Amino acid sequence: MLYNNAADFEIAKVLKQDIKIYFDTLEETFATSGGKDFLVKHTKKIDSILKHVYKVATRDMFGDYLPMKNSIPLSLVALGSYGREQLCVHSDIDLMLVYKDVPGYNVKELIEKILYILWDTGLKLGHRVHTVDELFDVSKTDITIKTALIESRMIEGSSFIWMETQNAISQIRHDDVEEFIQQKLQEQEEKHRKYPLTMEPNLKEGVGGFRDANLVFWIGKIHFNVENIKNLPAHIINEKEYKTFRIALEFLFRVRSALHLVSKKKEDKLRLDLIPYVATILGYENSKKGHMRFAKKVTDSLKTVRLYSTIWIETLTRDYHK
């Protein structure tokens, strides 16, 4: 049906049912996956849905005269945690559609078709639409946008547009480096004040949470264009430190995924009433002692991430402290 001139809403209806079946089986997938591995699997599944929608939309637009992908001036780009392949189950899917307004291609209509189908599937989509030439100016309007752009990843579409996008991102990465770092450090301080390490920690925004780990990556990306933290230079990070940090982070990935699965929604605060359910899904004994062991490991892991991220951020930013 998807390739036989079906209406967009019919396509979305079929995809919506497939997505529901997929989400219903996530706990089984989680049980046999590691922390980051589960996030990568989920990310790849979302990638496959977006690629499918792109394929359907382009075939519908061009029919028997479908050009090569590289000839259609549009790329679908993942941003944020989706770009890092760390997309949690109920987190928003941050998508950017980058295009060039080339005469002869009705790219804007194609973009609308893609978005309408995706909206109708029920996916929690956050999207941006920009021409390649807009990216630099857009990045200067909001530090959140700049941050998202420097951790972007191509999903589908024209590799030519993606190459131009990468060139724009390289320019963005080198622009106002000191101001970017100062703003991110200030942002971190504010988040730590708002979400201190308590008995109900915020795994994303709080002390020792994913934002601390992300900040190491963002600053490392700005300075060294690394693809992950472990690729930072040896004078900043050593293998033993990284291994300890990574074990803690891997555990927190599993905790956050379990928290989303148990809550059946986006939830980053490990509330006391949820601890028994999250602990159980992670294999801890369903008893007060088991719950306490789990809560202690969460706290210890957050402290580990906080410790090493602080050391590395201090080294990476020592020239920018005022």
Predicted regions and their residues:
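A nucleotide- and high-energy phosphate-metabolite-utilizing enzyme signature
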Residues: 1-322
